[in-house]
Design a protein with these regions (language model features):
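Start-transfer (signal-anchor) and selected internal transmembrane alpha helices
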Residues: 1-17
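Juxtamembrane/transmembrane-helix boundary motifs in multi-pass membrane proteins
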Residues: 1-5, 65, 69, 73, ...
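Membrane-interface elements of multi-pass transporters and channels
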Residues: 32, 66, 91-99, 118-119
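Membrane-interface micro-motifs in multi-pass membrane enzymes
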Residues: 38, 49-53, 97, 101-148
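Core alpha-helical transmembrane segments of integral membrane proteins
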Residues: 72, 76-89, 99-105, 124
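Transmembrane-helix motifs of polytopic, lipid-linked glycan transferases
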Residues: 78-95, 137-146
Length: 148
């Protein structure tokens, strides 16, 4: 039982975030997917690959389409954030009694996504809602692999 105790603050925080997003930001989440079109064609993939960070945008667009049903998109986002917290704990070797520190990157990503306000309509970066989360997760995973 003691082995699963450190994950409880993470799950509690993610549940609180999910309830808040689904209660107050459902319309915003639906509009995010509306303005981020994902096509599963080779042309769309090649078009994104010529841009810097194209694979990141492609994966971000893929996950953004799940906001068509906001609960499903929030579930995907919270899943990425849970993975990020786990990787943060492993990469920085955070002790079990300090596992709350792994919430800091998630809090920063949440603020970054929610503070865009009207800029959601002007953003030219495709998949921008998931791009910082996936990029941070990839960076922390590479750091963990380097330190292992």
């Amino acid at each position: 039982m003691k082995r699963f105790i450190p994950i409880l603050p993470w799950l509690g925080a993610l549940l609180l975030i999910a309830v808040a997003l689904l209660s107050f930001e459902t319309d915003l989440l639906w509009r995010v997917q509306l303005y981020n079109l994902f096509l599963d064609t080779p042309l769309f993939f090649r078009e994104l690959m010529v841009e810097p960070g194209g694979l990141l945008s492609y994966v971000g667009c893929y996950f953004t389409q799940f906001f068509y049903h906001p609960w499903l998109g929030v579930l995907m986002l919270c899943g990425w954030w849970l993975l990020l917290m786990w990787l943060t704990k492993r990469a920085f070797r955070i002790a079990d009694n300090w596992t709350v520190l792994a919430l800091i990157p998630v809090a920063i990503l949440l603020v970054a996504d929610m503070s865009l306000c009207y800029w959601h309509y002007y953003m030219k970066l495709r998949g921008y809602f998931f791009v910082p989360t996936i990029g941070t997760t990839a960076g922390v995973a590479m750091l963990w692999a380097f330190r292992a």
